[in-house]
Amino acid sequence: MPIFILPKTDPTRPALRCFITFLMILFFMAIPCITPLAASGDESIFRTALPSTEWRMEGQSYAFLPQNLYEYINGEAEFFIAFGFIELTGANYTSVGGDNDTVTIDIYDMGNKLNAFGVFQSKRGGQISALNVGAASTGSDGYLAFYKNRFFVEIQAYIASEKQKHGVETLAASIAAQLSGDNTPPWELFYLPEKNRITGSERYIKGGILGHAFLDRGMVGDYRIQGQKITAFVAMLPSPRDAVHAVEQHRSFLLKSGEKCLPFDGVGHHGFVSEEPYHQKIIEAQVGAFVAGVYDLSTIEPGKTLLEDIIKTIKQMEPK
């Protein structure tokens, strides 16, 4: 724990001492709020989640933090850290039958449900799965992933014996049952209307929707309307002023790219219609602290209808 040493000062400088004392108070108040997986006692999951006596935990569980995650997953560390990664806790299992079957379970504490959802959707790559584990899950031979609350879980199995292959989903369900929280998706997902939305296409983007830093983070989903497959987004900004600024930055970018920006006053504010490089037509508007848009449009009409629905949904969800 850090030790704060106050510098020697004369009585005429009380403000500095008060400021440092204030920082110390904030630091100690924050300590109880830091409850990653290991600190919360959930690491016992690894010993209690065994689906049968045919598996045993190999040694102790292990843990990695943002500063050393690269030692475990190397190039993927930056991806997880970008989504708010707090801690990884994991364990290895071996078969007691001498079949050399092994299972590795890694539980990523992502800080909140939205971050865990974002990681899961990115990792599953749009695959639809019938697995019923956690809030959502996906799997193939030797691999299963799911998320629940703020946790993203990966299970990798190397199993030769047929009788053990079906035990991976059972093990995953046991892990999920012991993680805190519920199986509901993040509420931000519902900014995207369900009607005509392509199941499994929803994702949480951090680092720039359409590659634009001014649309740093938000929800994105694909829709099929009037025979067109189009994409909608809701960028979440710190304030309405920031949202207006983001729309203006986008408009400026398109104009500098040689595209025309026609005004769109149907819904929202500061709206425009233009051509997004590599993504056909785009329609965009600001509402509150959000920027909503639809792109990959061959014609504008489906985009107008969807944008109206999105902005209506945002207004219903946000407090007046």
What role is predicted for each listed range?
Residues 1-16:
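N-terminal secretory signal peptides that target proteins for export/translocation
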Residues 20-33:
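Bacterial N-terminal signal peptides
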Residues 36-41:
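Boundary at the C-terminal end of the N-terminal hydrophobic targeting segment
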Residues 43, 159-189, 297-320:
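Surface-exposed amphipathic alpha-helical segments
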Residues 56-83, 100, 110-149, 190-215, ...:
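Short Gly/Thr-rich strand-loop-strand
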Residues 81-119, 153-155, 220-246:
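A short acidic-to-branched-hydrophobic micro-motif
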Residues 145, 152-155, 284, 291-294:
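Structural recognition of the beta-strand scaffold that forms the well-ordered cores
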Residues 196-225, 293, 299, 314:
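Terminal interaction module
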